[in-house]
Amino acid sequence: MRIGVLGFQGGVYEHVYMLKKSFHELGINGKVLIVKKPQQLHDLDGIIIPGGESTTISILARKTNVLELLREKIVEGLPVMGVCAGAIMLAKEVVDQVVGETKQPLLGVMDIAVTRNYFGRQRESFELDIVLDELDDKPFRAVFIRAPAITKYWGATKPIGIINYNGEKVVVAARENNKLALSFHPELTSDTRIHRYFIEKIIKK
């Protein structure tokens, strides 16, 4: 099994570590590749788009000709996990909590609408225990950093993680077939359950 991590920005090496740890725990002979060129997208079984700054990642992915090929691969069925900025890139609709509609180049492959910086800027980062459908009943310690929220979903997309925030129910994790979008950063914990879920339930399905 070969899983790529888009390597332009964000928690790239944290995801590499968590994938290797997950492979070990699952007894899988797997390889993790950092992807920065179009040719590195071939022969992958899955890819993670890490957090960071979504506009920067999108622009770099477009300049290196990775964006279009990655879009094609995902549409063809390549399993993908988008984390924070990665979830923004997957979304078909994106607005910013402060500036409104954004014009950044997106993959636009998942039937979700995302609001950037939904919970505020850096000072409003927080951690929260959440229970995720399809995982197990044990809470997952979710780390939110300038996080987006999934404000709308349609088609085959289903929410798998919902939190209460300011008296409202907010979707922070969703899945649509081969696509997994997360508002929070699972790579910033020692808990590999989400990475293992991506490997076992989405890639190996």
Swiss-Prot record:
Gene3D superfamilies registered for this protein in UniProt: 3.40.50.880
InterPro entries assigned: Class_I_gatase-like, PdxT/SNO, PdxT/SNO_CS
EC number: 4.3.3.6, 3.5.1.2
Catalytic activity from the UniProt record: aldehydo-D-ribose 5-phosphate + D-glyceraldehyde 3-phosphate + L-glutamine = pyridoxal 5'-phosphate + L-glutamate + phosphate + 3 H2O + H(+); L-glutamine + H2O = L-glutamate + NH4(+)
Biological or metabolic pathway of the protein: Cofactor biosynthesis; pyridoxal 5'-phosphate biosynthesis
Keyword presence, Lipoprotein: no
Keywords associated with the record: Glutamine amidotransferase, Hydrolase, Lyase, Pyridoxal phosphate
GO CC annotation terms, alphabetical: cytosol; glutaminase complex
GO terms classed as biological process: glutamine catabolic process; pyridoxal phosphate biosynthetic process; pyridoxine metabolic process
Cystines in this chain: none
Pfam families listed in its UniProt record: SNO
Binding site for L-glutamine: 52-54, 116, 145-146
GO molecular function, one term: pyridoxal 5'-phosphate synthase (glutamine hydrolysing) activity
Catalytic residues (positions): 84 (nucleophile), 185 (charge relay system), 187 (charge relay system)
Role noted for this protein: Catalyzes the hydrolysis of glutamine to glutamate and ammonia as part of the biosynthesis of pyridoxal 5'-phosphate. The resulting ammonia molecule is channeled to the active site of PdxS.
Quaternary organization: In the presence of PdxS, forms a dodecamer of heterodimers. Only shows activity in the heterodimer.
PANTHER family: PYRIDOXAL 5'-PHOSPHATE SYNTHASE SUBUNIT SNO (PTHR31559), PYRIDOXAL 5'-PHOSPHATE SYNTHASE SUBUNIT SNO1-RELATED (PTHR31559:SF0)
Similarity-based family: Belongs to the glutaminase PdxT/SNO family.
Name under which the protein is recorded: Pyridoxal 5'-phosphate synthase subunit PdxT
